[in-house]
C-alpha cells in the first residue's frame, strides 16, 4: 500500500503569538459589542513584562484598552513574572489611531454605503478547505494537534497537572493513503508535545502525565500502535516561556488558525480585524462554501479560492478544486457555490453575523483554530446543503 506522512502543529493559548491574537480579538469584541459598525485593525506585540496594542480603530465604543489587555493575559494564566508575564504589573502600551480617511471613503463611504455596496477593505486572496476524513470536515493532523493543545490548557487550569505553565506547542504526524484524491488516515506516526512547566517536576513525570492526561483522552486508540513515536518535551527543559521566552506578535500563526498546512493560504491573518477586512470575512465564507460542498456529498475534499480588489464589492474570481473527488464536474460545483454564497463583504458580514461582538465571540477564535469548531458563534461552520440541478 502506497502511503505518505503529513504533519500539522498547534500552539496553545499561552504561546506569545497566540496571546497577541487573543488580545487583538478581545479588543475587536469590545468595539463591536458597543458599535457594530466599528472599523478595527488591531495589532498586538509582547515581550518580557510588556504588551503593546497598536493599529487603526474608528469606533463610537468607549473601550478601556489597558483593562482588556490585562484581563486577557490574566484569563490565559499569566499571573506572575515567573510563568512568563504578570498581567497586573506588566507595562501596557497603546498606540491606536483612526482608520485612514482614504480607506474609509473607498471601502464604506464613511459608513454611507448600503451593505451590498461595501467594498473589500483590501486586495487579497483567501482559501477555504474541507475534507471528509473527520466529522469536523477538517484534516486529522490539524484536529489532533489542536485538541492536544486545548487539553494541555484544560488539565493546567483544572489542576490535574498543577506543574503545567501556560505556554506550549504540539505537533502530530499522520500516515495517510490517497484514495482517488481523498485523504484516508491510517495511523498516528508521531506525537510531539513541548510544554512549559515549573521547576519542581521531573522529565519522567512530565512524559508520564502527558501520556495519561493529554494524549490518551485526545488521540483515538485505533490510530495508535506500538510503532507510534512520542517526543515529550524533547529539549529537556521548558521553564521560561510566554513573552519572557519569546516575543509575540498578532498574525504569526495563520496555518494553525486554518488547516494545518493542508489546502492553501493567501497569507492574510484574522485576529483584530472587523468584517470589512476580507482577510477574515473572505476566508470564513470560503470555508463555509468548501465545507458545504463536502457535507452535501458533492466531493470528498474541496478547496475554494476567492479574490478581491480594495473598494470593489464583487470578488474578482472564485475558484474550486475537488482534487478529482467530485461527484459532478468542478465547473458545476463552482456554479452551485456562486448561486448559494454571496461573496460581497457587506453581505458576508450580514449572512454570517460578523458584526456581533462581545461574549468572547472573536476571542474564542484566536486560540485552537477558527474552523471545525462546534460552537454557534462560529456561524461560518453552518452547512448549506447544495443540490445539483
UniProtKB/Swiss-Prot annotation:
Question: Where along the chain is K(+) bound?
Answer: 43
Write down how the cofactor binds this protein. Answer: Binds 2 divalent ions per subunit. The metal ions interact primarily with the substrate. Can utilize magnesium, manganese or cobalt (in vitro). Binds 1 potassium ion per subunit. The potassium ion interacts primarily with the substrate.
Annotated binding of Mg(2+), by residue: 9
Swiss-Prot/TrEMBL catalytic activity:
L-methionine + ATP + H2O = S-adenosyl-L-methionine + phosphate + diphosphate
Q: Fetch the InterPro entries from UniProt.
A: ADOMET_SYNTHASE_CS, S-AdoMet_synt_C, S-AdoMet_synt_central, S-AdoMet_synt_N, S-AdoMet_synthetase, S-AdoMet_synthetase_sfam
Gene Ontology CC terms, in alphabetical order: cytoplasm
Question: Which cysteines bridge via disulfide bonds?
Answer: none
Question: What are the recorded Gene Ontology BP terms?
Answer: one-carbon metabolic process; S-adenosylmethionine biosynthetic process
Tell me where it mainly resides. Answer: cytoplasm
Ligase listed as a keyword: no
Q: In which pathway does it act?
A: Amino-acid biosynthesis; S-adenosyl-L-methionine biosynthesis; S-adenosyl-L-methionine from L-methionine: step 1/1
Q: Which cofactor does it need?
A: Mn(2+); Mg(2+); Co(2+); K(+)
Binding sites annotated in the UniProt record for ATP: 15, 167-169, 235-238, 246, 252-253, 269, 273, 277
Keyword Nucleotide-binding (UniProt): yes
The family this protein is said to belong to: Belongs to the AdoMet synthase family.
Q: How does it assemble?
A: Homotetramer.
Q: What protein name is recorded for this chain?
A: S-adenosylmethionine synthase 3
- The organism is Vitis vinifera (Grape)
